[in-house]
UniProtKB/Swiss-Prot annotation:
UniProt organism field: Anabaena sp. (strain L31)
Stated family: Belongs to the phycobiliprotein family.
Assembly description: Heterodimer of an alpha and a beta subunit, which further assembles into trimers and the trimers into hexamers.
Topology within the bilayer: Peripheral membrane protein
Listed name of the protein: C-phycocyanin beta subunit
Amino acid sequence: MTLDVFTKVVSQADSRG
């Protein structure tokens, strides 16, 4: 699992707030 994938998931969660 690369950081790129992790960042993508975090980005989605952050967008939801």
